[in-house]
Amino acid sequence: MASAGSTARRAGSGSWHSERGEGRGARPQPTPSGSMQQANKVSLKATWTDAESKQPSQPLPDLADHLSAQATALARPRRPASLTPPRADPSPSKESDQTAIDQTAIGSYYQLFAAAVGNVEWLRFCLNQSLREIPTDDKGFTAIHFAAQWGKLACLQVLVEEYKFPVDLLTNNSQTPLHLVIHRDNTTVALPCIYYLLEKGADLNAQTCNGSTPLHLAARDGLLDCVKVLVQSGANVHAQDAMGYKPIDFCKIWNHRACARFLKDAMWKKDKKDFAREMTKMKMFKSQLTLMEHNYLIEYQKEHKILREAAIRKWLHGKLHPGHSLVSNTKQARATALSKTPEQRESQRSRSFHPSVDARLQCIPQPTEMPKPIYRKPTVKRPTMWNVSNNPARPPTTQISHSQGIRLGVHPDPTPEHDFSSFLEVRPDGHGGARLHTVDGHWVAPVPRLPFEVLLRMLYPRVWPYRMKVPQGFYPISMREVPRKRHLGDNTFWTDTLAMNLRDTFDEAFLAAVRSHQGLPTLPSPQTNP
């Protein structure tokens, strides 16, 4: 009866439903009813079948009273329609229906009770006698929630594998069994239950009504082993609750230093991994932008060539008629300018920003296709005989001369990166990222999820010099602004104070020297012991 006694103590210490994030409330008072009296009578006859309880058990005072009240609540709102036919007058059939309802409430009461105490045989018996629907109490707790709350792994296995209970079944506060199993009272039994629920597909990042994830609860209670299991299984270390707190914030609030160190290291690794992945995407993104700019400049060059040829033909056509006056040419040019469409005007305006298209095409690296691998039959090369002659004219001729260049550094010079400042306009999106807009009026998406400064430095390398990346915040200052020490001369009292601090005793010669220099300083009066 050890487990039953411990269950009774835990039930008396707080509410039967530990809301995990909302606090433990007061224990509800039992509701006397006829069905509950019958349930208490049956509980007096029930015997434990587990190895830990072989003797007949008395009903647990606090736990039984609470579950009796829950059974009363179960009997009222979840009354099946088939068991309560509408009748105007009392009849024996109505009494039989009420008896069936009472039996259903008793079955639900014992089902939750068996799951909480961990009696597998009793739980199977109650589940076989109950209806097909899953009974719940007034807070939405079912048998799988009670089994998870008290860390009963055997009951969890029976409910999930034999009776197909969902592992992510929600309560009224959107709590899952994985939320309920993580608690400081379940330190010794929480890990096996967590491993089992994760194996069965439990949601790692499920959030309650206040936005708490299982990792938030483990970090708040300082359960380092649970935190490690959740993080290694893929829990989101940057998840925020309704108040914007992360799991590491709860570690700081409750002074769980070990959990805070582990979460800080996990967050750093996650950030670096995400940054490396986005930088890989950025390389592919820049190659796509280069191809887009190359195609745009080719189309622009073709359009510019067509317009230039049309202008030349128009000029030649005007030269073939020397009789018309300059006024007619001016009117014709004005009419031609007015007849242009807005698209042509915009094209002409955008061309003014590109004075040299050919030069830009030469600067853009040509998009190259990946060479196809060509299989070549390996050839076997036999080593040649060593030339034993000391005549340098005989083949193979020895070549020892080589033009040696002068290097000014150890590392190779970085290749110049292409600048997209004349093709792209980078704007902040308000969330730390950037939005890209081309000169031809198109938005580029999707953009790698990188900070705005990183995107600006990658796309505008001329604006952000390469050597100014590290150290951050390095800038030249004037020597006049450098803080300097104050010059201490002979007339400064500081020298006398230093000399007085270095002496153990003040003899007459020393006091005379200090008095002749600037005078004796004001010494603090000695404190007398009361």
From Swiss-Prot:
Any one GO cellular component localisation term in the record: spindle pole
Its biological purpose: Required for normal progression through mitosis. Involved in chromosome alignment and cytokinesis via regulation of microtubules polymerization.
Pfam families, alphabetized: Ank (PF00023), Ank_2 (PF12796)
Biased composition (Low complexity): 1-15
The gene coding this protein: ANKRD53
Stretch list, region Disordered: 1-99, 323-360, 383-402
Species name: Homo sapiens
UniProt record, GO biological process: cell division; mitotic metaphase chromosome alignment; positive regulation of microtubule polymerization; regulation of mitotic cytokinesis; regulation of mitotic spindle organization
Location within or outside the cell: Cytoplasm, Cytoskeleton, Spindle; Cytoplasm, Cytoskeleton, Spindle pole
Stretches with biased composition (Polar residues): 32-41, 326-341, 386-402
InterPro entries according to UniProt: ANKRD53 (IPR042335), Ankyrin_rpt (IPR002110), Ankyrin_rpt-contain_sf (IPR036770)
Major subcellular location class: cytoplasm
PROSITE patterns, sorted: ANK_REP_REGION (PS50297), ANK_REPEAT (PS50088)
Protein name: Ankyrin repeat domain-containing protein 53
ANK repeats mapped onto the chain: 139-169, 173-206, 210-239
Superkingdom of this protein's organism: Eukaryota
Keyword line: ANK repeat, Cell cycle, Cell division, Cytoplasm, Cytoskeleton, Mitosis, Phosphoprotein, Repeat
Subunit structure: Interacts with PSRC1; recruited by PSRC1 to the spindle during mitosis.
Modifications after synthesis and translation: Phosphorylated during mitosis.
Gene3D superfamilies in the cross-refs: Ankyrin repeat-containing domain
